[in-house]
């Protein structure tokens, strides 16, 4: 037969799945799932879909939780959005967070205004605020650091407390832990950096080996690629200063400019192939195409 005109004035349970407004039938709440919005006292305008979604919510308002255990422990947090299994699972009082993807922002507790899109994005974050992570495992290990931006698979994935970093591209700044104010744009840019601060790497594999070196600027594919602990180098152009390891205060502008310098310092090379064979000497100045190309002294 056909059932028409059915009116149900209270929550209903169908095969252990609750459909309705949740505990206390607070106005504006929508519930679909076993245990969803189970503890709500006065929190209104919440949407909970999935097993135990928003189950502990008491006074939090304007939250959306879609997926099993999404926003599971939220109590008073408001204006959060969680889509995916266990997304924002441990949030209690954090506000204005957006988590899309399985385990996204899972351990966030009290932090506000984070955006995580992708599986495990910002998963370990607890109190770090105003972070943006887009991509699977982006900012995965971040705990208390704030104001980081990671766009790309595993971008800034190892970061824990380093703040104000920007990583755009696959594996960019992947090993960064506590370093701050770094900018890495390009596949594997500054991927080995751990504690070096204030570096700028733009281009695939630029500054890729840097670990603790600080205040370096690398613009171009593989620029300063092999630099590890050196500071205050500037390389602009394909593989400019590409072989540098520990040399410091060098400036190379032009494709493969000073590309062989390894430990030399205070060198200036302006022009394509300028100072290309110099390795360990210091304080050279080469301006123009292939200037001092064969210089070794």
Range-by-range predicted roles:
Residues 9-297:
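Glycine- and small/polar-enriched repetitive beta-structure motifs of secreted/surface proteins
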